[in-house]
């Protein structure tokens, strides 16, 4: 268990470059509770990363991929019980239950702290506790915030180095008394003296806990990304959303992209889609044939922090430094830029291994390889798949890759001031009812659209698949406070923008997933979504027309640019039509959502629903 390579920083004593007394005392308190064998103060260097990955290869946690095929890249395969976020074990422990709201799990803070004290007592015995300093957002940005994660998982440390700005430079920004979000993580698998470790330690008991008032995160029992990489959903959305409410900004489950016209005019769009609904594909979109001169650039693919600038407009950063993307379905056809990003320096999790030491997943190629080792270490062939239905890669298999490797990365992706947002887009996976694109007539109507959006569940959350659930703003699993208060915060943001007399971002709702009578998707999606994006940009510029209906404004067939695509008026009608009977049922479902959220639900949203109902029956 001895790691002499870490001797320089393997101590309860902090290195000289850590000058933050409260941070040091906190590390000492957690160490006294969790009782690790050693403490390593991470510096974020390449040497440290190389040591950790070599250590994990030796332990069987990682497999080094063929350097000729996939340089400096690794494959991790998790325990089969630890493959996704665990929403039923995720808690918002606010002082008052009503502050967590009906969509979050709540336990009284004192009770939860007693539970965690018991779980973490000796939880890191026999293991190393890593002190991982990280910045969410460019170092020193006025939109960025700092966190420090204490974890007994080298897998977490390695992923955090890719996903955040991690290392010694964070302490320079933090100084002696800067604010940071304290994050504590353990896989919950202490080792007795002489006990052999397993390749993927975890515990059947899992807790992912947030204390909004003290801005703390505690995670126990899981080594999986969303549960263990605490800078991601836990900090960047759940805790940050509560910070944003208190401080007047937004932390959102959104991609951010730049769209530049052939004339060189650039706009920025932030878009929210539930997990595995095409967020990364949209963020890295390549304009299709016939739309020459248009260019899409990527600022972020998953999370946006949005703060008012000095001019009153909303400015966004991507708080992450990497992509933690869903692998299955990603291919050179569906997302060329993502595949190019994955050529080197990647950690893959729960994908399949090819016989020549590379990776594969469902959807990567038209034909699967003749033989693979699946994500659970078993032989896999197309014949086995046909007979058993077994997937080679887990449906929620992931890649962790540096954002800097993306060919479509925006020149401003690390601009500390952020980029100005011209439009918000919201979308879910709906096979019926919701049109291809609708523009809200005003901010309140846009907030209503986002508040009532629905999507089918995905493999990113453990549980049932294929069921439509309401997912307001794509934030249902990620909002760190009462959802009704969250809606009110969005409405208040709109009022502030109006008071500042700045151009308010337009709000659009999209649905790429309408199906025809044959059960197939009608809209081709992927790069063709550029045609919808162009209409949005032209609406911002006042150049494009549309047709008003009960729910807003949608394009007519001739309002879209069809150059290079054979898509008939009949097909367009299938994806754009508004069925009044279906929408009356939809509004009834909106009422069910509002009944769930009735405590504190803004009157403006109830009034909007009533107005829509009247329009439908007029």
UniProtKB/Swiss-Prot annotation:
It holds the Pfam family PEPCK_N. Keywords: Cytoplasm, Decarboxylase, Gluconeogenesis, GTP-binding, Lyase, Manganese, Metal-binding, Nucleotide-binding. Pathway: Carbohydrate biosynthesis; gluconeogenesis. Its main location: cytoplasm. Monomer. NCBIfam families: PRK04210.1. This is Phosphoenolpyruvate carboxykinase [GTP]. It comes from Paraburkholderia phymatum (strain DSM 17167 / CIP 108236 / LMG 21445 / STM815) (Burkholderia phymatum).
């Amino acid at each position: 268990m001895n790691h002499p390579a870490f001797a320089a920083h393997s101590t309860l004593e902090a290195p000289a470059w850590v000058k933050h007394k409260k941070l040091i005392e906190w590390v000492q308190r957690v160490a006294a509770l969790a009782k690790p064998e050693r403490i390593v103060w991470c510096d974020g260097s390449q040497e440290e990363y190389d040591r950790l990955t070599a250590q994990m290869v030796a332990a069987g946690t990682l497999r080094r991929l063929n350097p000729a095929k996939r340089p400096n890249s690794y494959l991790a395969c998790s325990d089969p019980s630890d493959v996704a976020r665990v929403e039923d074990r995720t808690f918002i422990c606010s002082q008052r239950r009503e502050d967590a709201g009906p969509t979050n799990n709540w336990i009284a803070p004192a009770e939860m702290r007693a539970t965690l004290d018991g779980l973490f007592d000796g939880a890191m015995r026999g293991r190393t506790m890593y002190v991982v300093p990280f910045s969410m957002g460019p170092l020193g940005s006025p939109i960025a915030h700092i966190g420090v994660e204490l974890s007994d998982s080298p897998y977490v440390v390695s992923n955090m180095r890719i996903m955040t700005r991690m290392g010694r430079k964070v302490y320079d920004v933090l100084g002696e008394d800067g604010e940071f979000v304290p994050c504590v993580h353990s896989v919950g698998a202490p080792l007795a003296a002489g006990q052999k470790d397993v390749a993927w330690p975890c515990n059947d008991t899992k807790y992912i806990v947030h204390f909004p008032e003290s801005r703390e995160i505690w995670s126990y029992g899981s080594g999986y990304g969303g549960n263990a990489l605490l800078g991601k959903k836990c900090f960047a959305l759940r805790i940050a959303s509560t910070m944003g409410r208190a401080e007047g900004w937004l932390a959102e489950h959104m991609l951010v992209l730049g769209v530049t016209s052939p004339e060189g005019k650039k706009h920025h769009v932030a878009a929210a889609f539930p997990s595995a609904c095409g967020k990364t594909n949209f963020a890295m979109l390549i304009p299709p044939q016939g739309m020459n001169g248009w260019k899409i650039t990527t600022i972020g693919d998953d999370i946006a922090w949005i703060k008012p600038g000095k001019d009153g407009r909303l400015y966004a950063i991507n708080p992450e430094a990497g992509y933690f993307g869903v692998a299955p379905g990603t291919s050179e056809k569906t997302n060329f830029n993502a595949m190019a990003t994955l050529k080197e320096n990647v950690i893959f999790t729960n994908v399949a291994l090819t016989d020549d030491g590379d990776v594969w997943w469902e959807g990567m190629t038209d034909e699967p390889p003749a033989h693979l080792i699946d994500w659970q270490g078993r032989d896999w062939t197309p014949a086995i798949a046909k007979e058993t239905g077994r997937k080679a890669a887990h449906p929620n298999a992931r890649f962790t890759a540096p954002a800097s490797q993306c060919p479509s990365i925006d020149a401003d992706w690390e601009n500390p001031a952020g980029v100005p947002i011209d439009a918000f887009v919201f979308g879910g996976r709906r096979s019926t009812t919701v049109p291809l694109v609708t523009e809200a007539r005003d901010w309140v109507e846009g907030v209503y659209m986002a508040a009532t959006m629905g999507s089918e569940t995905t493999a990113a959350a453990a549980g049932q698949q294929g069921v439509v659930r309401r997912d307001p703003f794509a934030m249902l699993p990620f909002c760190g406070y009462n959802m009704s208060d969250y809606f009110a915060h969005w409405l208040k943001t709109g009022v502030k923008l109006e008071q500042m007399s700045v151009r308010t971002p337009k709000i659009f709702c999209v649905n790429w997933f309408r199906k025809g009578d044959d059960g197939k998707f009608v809209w081709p999606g992927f790069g063709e979504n550029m045609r919808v994006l162009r209409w949005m940009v032209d609406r911002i510029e006042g150049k494009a027309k549309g047709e008003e209906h009960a729910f807003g404004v949608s394009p007519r067939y001739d309002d879209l640019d069809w150059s290079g695509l054979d898509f008939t008026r009949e097909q367009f009608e299938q994806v754009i039509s508004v069925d009044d009977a279906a929408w009356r049922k939809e509004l009834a479902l909106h009422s069910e959502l509002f009944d769930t959220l009735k405590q504190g639900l803004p009157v403006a949203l109830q009034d909007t629903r009533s107005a829509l109902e009247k329009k439908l029956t007029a």
